[in-house]
Amino acid sequence: KFLERILSDKFSLVEDIKSVKVGNEKTLTLSIGIGTGANDYARNYEIAKAAMDLALGRGGDQAVIKDGDKIYYYGGKSQQMEKNTRVKVRVKAHALRQILEANDNVLIMGHSLPDIDSFGSALGIYIIAKKLRKEAHIVFGEVSTSVRPFMNRFINKEEYPDDMFISKDNAESYIKPSTVVIVVDVNRAQRTECPILLDKCKTVIVFDHHRRSSDTITGAVLSYVDPYASSACEMVTEMIQYVDDGIKLRAFEADALYAGISIDTDGFNSKSGPRTFEAAAFLRRHGADVTRVRKMLRNDMNEYKAIASAVSKSEVYKNCLLYTSDAADDLIGVDL
């Protein structure tokens, strides 16, 4: 009965607690984990602990109810307060270096249909691995039109091996006993570029800035999921500075990381804190050029036409949903 009562109220307490002012400078937030559905108290307690871990892993300021295999989320609408924790970054960077030094081969992948944040952060990890003299490959499937201009700058170049980028269809053939799989910009197994790598390799590392979900990757030897970071590129840029002082980025490498931050922050207009600008400043010092990045991110005329065609044929449903009936062939590879 008590659970039904607070469910009907949609956990308004999570929002009400923010109005409490008793001399505190920062806004108070509340995280709640509730476990139910089991036959005994001890089991429900364990389920509640898992629900609390999930609530905190998603950034806090919310309630999570775990009822068997079903999970319900409430709250989590407040502006995320940035955690400027250099110590945490150093610890994660040191752990990453130790793991890489103990292994010989690195496979890096982001989410399926990768955007520029996924590409840039994967590139940053690749640079770290190569600095530590490790064999490294970035796993790719379909490449979007926004990523292609950046990717082309590394293909058929003397400075980079031909197998820097490998197809997800061939990724399994690169697995060795000492292979480390590093996942960036995603923490859900089924959304990765090649999920089977997670099952085939014992050593998995996850770096992501999205809130954890119920199907997050489990069993990772190192997991750094920071929902307060603006982007995966910001996180990786920070780690580059701590893994090795001798890492020097080429200008077009810095461009890719800068582009990832720029896109995920809408041109530094949202989720941009001190860490974001410090990472951007580091990349600018290594040659990232704002004008060059903006030109590379522009849509070409065919993309503009495809988007305009889709919008012109769209309809509003119940004043809230926009849908279009444009031919799929016109939109393949176009980032909307």
Regions found by a protein language model. Give the residues of each.
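Active-site cofactor/cluster-binding pocket
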Residues: 162-219
